Design a protein with these regions (language model features):
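Bacterial N-terminal signal peptides
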Residues: 11-23
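C-terminal beta-sandwich/jelly-roll accessory domains of carbohydrate-active enzymes
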Residues: 375-450
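Cap/lid segment of the alpha/beta-hydrolase catalytic domain
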Residues: 114-193, 246-259
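Catalytic cores of secreted or luminal carbohydrate-active enzymes
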Residues: 298, 302-366, 375-382, 387
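N-terminal cap/lid segment of alpha/beta-hydrolase-fold proteins
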Residues: 43-93
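Short beta-strand element of the alpha/beta-hydrolase
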Residues: 82, 93-103, 123
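The feature captures the conserved acid-bearing segment of alpha/beta-hydrolase catalytic domains
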Residues: 250-310
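Primarily recognizes the serine-hydrolase "nucleophile elbow" in alpha/beta-hydrolase
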Residues: 196-261
């Protein structure tokens, strides 16, 4: 079964503060004022990659390599990214290629590479969180041996050993500049540089079709998926998960009070908003996007995921949600990633459209109802409808509704105890897949998704 959810919430009232936060700072003459200005001087193809092959082997019908490539030179020192690369052995055609971006505290994943190789892709999993030395976790790639070269950021450190760097524009000994405030001092800028160089690695491999590149990532990797898709038109399909939503710098007003921003920005908040916040990247995305998440995720907040992706112009956008969870995905949601990539990169069938939904407020019994019309491109197995009166997405309790089915249409009553509360509703439609799909290459997965 494959889960897709509605393209937007049905909302009676959702209270969100939209006030611009400023700090009255004087900007230097070279301070960029937009995403385009921030990235105008970066060419991901300019420098040679200086690829090192640390190890290579054959396994399960694939060719695999532990590699390292040059990200760039910062403060006179080279920065190099370790990664795992693989592709199907004896491929007789140019292959689509996908970059996997790991989450916080994680590492380049051989399992993720194997999953994609088994489906006919070349795949690269970058090890942005690795460190070549010093104190703190090393985070070597999956399967690394003692003494293997690792990611080495040289004169900067955007890894999680420099946590404050994710929410700062200020200078520092580990940042891009040591003498002035600038968006390039932010860790996300440097990590996006590294990931875009990963795309360059992929497009230069002889077995890869450079016109068919995709990217997917989880958590902090979901953030980086949005950054890469918003800055690099080589990306033809993107799948962020539990990350990549905008307005993290902004306080949010709920019925119970005001929640502090997810990120407390050190430096000019308005410059951060215009150059590094995801609502400024979404309008620049020029590829189809599937967003996977959990309804109560702390990192990819549900309401703001919808707000952010609504800014993506003229591209197919889908959502797949695991209800009641925080920062984890059910198998029915996980499988949506390779199916999305298959359609846009590898000739697979199109996924069903987002179900149409209507919130009906006028009824004979005075009870609101949600009506859902599913796309029957794939057989519709069932529909789940949920509602809530909790305005804070992180603490929102989703109540299951009794669903009445009429063909591929579904209706559920959403009774309220009071009329002075917000009402939120969404639906998950489960489709039977064209064929069973395996996730067995990933840890903890056995039975195929059907």
């Amino acid at each position: 079964m494959f889960r897709l959810t509605l393209g937007s919430h049905a909302i009676l009232r959702c209270l969100m503060a939209l006030a611009l936060v400023t700090q009255g700072r004087v900007q230097s003459a070279d301070m960029p004022g937009s995403v385009g200005e921030l990235w105008a001087d970066f060419d991901p193809r300019r420098d040679p990659l200086e690829i090192e092959v640390i190890r290579e082997w054959q396994e399960d019908g694939g060719e695999f390599r532990h590699v390292r490539f040059l990200v760039g030179t910062f403060k006179g020192k080279p920065a190099r990214m370790a990664a795992l690369y693989g592709f199907p052995a004896n491929a007789d055609r140019k292959l689509p290629a996908v970059m996997h971006i790991h989450g916080g505290g994680q590492r380049a994943s051989l399992s993720e590479v194997k999953l994609l190789v088994a489906r006919g892709y070349a795949a690269l999993s970058v090890n942005w969180g690795g460190r070549g030395g010093g104190s703190g976790p090393v985070n070597a790639v999956e399967g690394a041996e003692t003494g293997d070269p690792n990611t080495d950021w040289g004169g900067v450190d955007p890894s999680q050993c420099n946590v404050q760097g994710y929410s700062t524009l200020e200078p520092g000994p580990l940042q891009y500049y040591e003498d002035r405030e600038h968006p390039k001092n932010n860790n996300w800028y440097l990590l996006t540089v590294g990931c875009r160089r990963g795309l360059t690695f992929l497009e230069q491999q002889p077995e890869v079709d450079p016109a068919r590149l995709g990217v997917h990532g989880y958590s902090m990797g979901g953030n980086l998926t949005m950054y890469v898709a918003g800055t690099d038109d080589r990306v033809k399909a993107a799948v962020p998960a539990v990350g990549g939503q905008g307005w993290r710098w902004q306080p949010h007003e709920f019925t119970g009070g005001v929640a502090a921003p997810q990120d407390r920005i050190a430096g000019d908040v308005d410059v951060f908003r215009r150059t590094l916040s995801f609502e400024s990247y979404a309008p620049l995305i020029r590829c189809p996007v599937l967003h996977r998440s959990a309804t109560n995720d702390f990192h990819g907040v549900m309401d703001d995921v919808y707000r952010t992706n609504a800014l993506i112009p003229g591209q197919p956008v889908r959502y797949s949600w695991t209800p009641h969870m925080n920062h984890r995905l059910a198998p029915e949601v996980e499988i949506a990633m390779p199916l999305w990539l298959d359609h846009f990169l590898n000739g697979g069938p199109p996924l069903p459209e987002t179900p149409a939904a209507a919130l009906v407020l006028q009824s004979a019994d005075g009870v609101p109802r949600l009506r859902v019309q599913a796309d029957a491109t794939w057989p519709v197995e069932r529909c789940e409808i949920f509602s809530s009166v909790d305005s804070d997405p992180l603490a929102r309790f989703w109540r299951s509704a009794d669903v009445v089915r009429d063909g591929d249409s579904f209706t559920a009553a959403l009774p309220l105890d009071a009329v002075d509360t917000p009402l939120f509703a969404f639906a998950n439609v489960y489709h039977t897949l064209p064929r069973p799909e395996s996730l067995a290459e990933l840890p903890g997965h056995g039975e195929p998704v059907r």
